[in-house]
Amino acid sequence: MITFFEKLSTFCHNLTPTECKVSVISFFLLAFLLMAHIWLSWFSNNQHCLRTMRHLEKLKIPYEFQYGWLGVKITIKSNVPNDEVTKKVSPIIKGEIEGKEEKKEGKGEIEGKEEKKEGKGEIEGKEEKKEVENGPRK
């Protein structure tokens, strides 16, 4: 009985069945890698757009987004002059603000900070040091 790869080998310019198997497997492997690359680039683009939208919401800049084949498209809608919006938005798009939190206005003191207690600085419940004789090691 003629196998699939034997039939395909005549179609593949008279390759041997083994060579045909290798070429078919490598073709499917390359197709899988290409699809994985496309999916990962689409996913990372969407993650970057979502991060950008969160920053735009913090800055209270109006925007709209659209889903497309290549990811998410963000359009900024603002009555503010372009220069001011560009100054705020360009570091977000470049990824420079990623992971940084906004500073709150104030003296910079931490709320709920306890006052320093006066004392010797010793910890309660601390055990006393025990002296150990240094003898020869066995």
UniProtKB/Swiss-Prot annotation:
The keyword Glycosyltransferase does not apply. The chain crosses the membrane at residues 19-40. It comes from the Eukaryota. Residues 98-138 are annotated as: Disordered. GO terms for cellular component: mitochondrial membrane. Residues 94-132 are annotated as: 3 X 13 AA tandem repeats of K-G-E-I-E-G-K-E-E-K-K-E-[GV]. It is found in: Mitochondrion membrane. Sequence repeats lie at residues 94-106, 107-119, 120-132. Expressed in roots, leaves and flowers. It is a single-pass membrane protein. Its main location: mitochondrion. Keywords: Membrane, Mitochondrion, Repeat, Transmembrane, Transmembrane helix. Nuclear restoration is accompanied by a dramatic reduction in the amount of this protein in mitochondria of flowers and leaves, but not roots of fertility-restored plants. The restorer genes are affecting either the translation or the stability of the protein. This is Uncharacterized mitochondrial protein ORF138.
